[in-house]
A protein has these predicted regions:
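Charged, long alpha-helical assembly modules
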Residues: 119-260, 264
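Charged, amphipathic alpha-helical linkers/stalks
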Residues: 28-120
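Residue-level marker of intrinsically disordered, low-complexity segments enriched
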Residues: 7, 34, 85, 91, ...
Length: 292
């Protein structure tokens, strides 16, 4: 609060006026940022991004991805990402309006990858992005891959899950730090969803049967930002397995059997946060509680 004595405007009125100004700051509701993933087997010489991509059926073993490990510690805000993509956002945007804006915008995967590495201060990865994008396109046999930025309750999933923030604002969600590597991987997952990838797996069972495998991301992974009730999903991967008669049985019997196998979907949900009971005992930092 600030107070100052001010002289009267008219000299024949005696005394002074006391002017008081008070500033009231309203704290935004707390928000968490999180994603859901699978624990993957670590192979010597493999990169973090390479392991993540294998989890959604993209084996890019012939492409060097180790340099992307430098993104693991970098944080990017959604607001900064939208600005880098040339998408204007009103300063007073509400959470519902922000969800609608994000869900209604799609950007080219290449542009998104470049914006992420640039904001993370890793400009040296811009050339690596070209090789990465070409490798993904070669696997899918497609070009012009697009990424939907947001999600609505009953619509397709985008890069960011639907933001749920009781009492929060769109501006606070735009300023939450999100892991750059998570953004990169999730962007690729969204862009490649619904497209089958040849895994390169082909088995011959003693000349009796042969099996070929393709995989597709039916539902992409997502990154969640929000308060209690916010949810994030891992990628739901569907495998297409074709069994055919091998060389030893080809003259006796013919088998051509397609099989579809779905991986279990993982969901993470914030059920409590920033309460005294959840504070870290040694540092006192606020924490969130999740249901997976």
């Amino acid at each position: 609060a600030f107070q100052k004595a001010s002289p009267t405007l008219l000299s024949f009125f005696t005394g002074n006026r006391l002017i008081s100004v008070s500033a009231v700051a309203a704290l935004s509701a707390p928000l968490a940022e999180f994603s859901v993933g699978s624990k993957l087997v670590v192979v010597s010489g493999d990169s973090t991004l390479g392991r993540l991509l294998k989890g959604i059926g993209l084996d890019l073993s012939g492409t060097s991805l180790v340099a992307y490990d430098g993104l693991a510690q970098a944080k990017i805000t959604p607001g900064g990402l939208l600005a880098a993509l040339g998408i204007p956002v009103a300063a007073d945007i509400g959470v519902g309006e922000l969800n609608t804006l994000l869900a209604g915008r799609s950007v080219a995967l290449g542009d998104l990858l470049n914006a992420i590495v640039t904001l993370a201060g890793q400009n040296s990865l811009l050339s690596s992005n070209i090789a990465l994008l070409q490798a993904i396109q070669a696997k899918l046999g497609l070009t012009n891959l697009m990424v939907q930025l947001g999600s609505l309750a009953d619509g397709p999933r985008g890069l960011f899950a639907q933001i749920i923030s009781p009492g929060g604002t769109g501006a606070s969600a735009l300023n939450v730090g999100v892991g750059a590597l998570d953004l990169l991987f999730t962007s690729i997952g969204v862009a490649t969803s619904q497209h089958a990838v040849d895994t390169g797996v082909s088995l011959d069972v003693l000349g009796l049967l042969t099996a070929t495998v393709k995989a597709a991301v039916i539902e992409p992974p997502s990154i969640a930002i929000g308060g209690i009730g916010a949810q994030a999903y891992n990628a739901q991967v569907r495998s297409f397995i074709t069994l055919k008669t091998g060389s030893l049985l080809s003259g006796l019997i013919k088998i051509d059997l397609p099989l579809v196998v779905d991986a279990v979907t993982g969901v993470g949900k914030v059920i409590d946060m920033c309460t005294p009971a959840l504070q870290a005992p040694t540092t006192g930092k606020d924490r969130a509680k999740f249901q997976v």
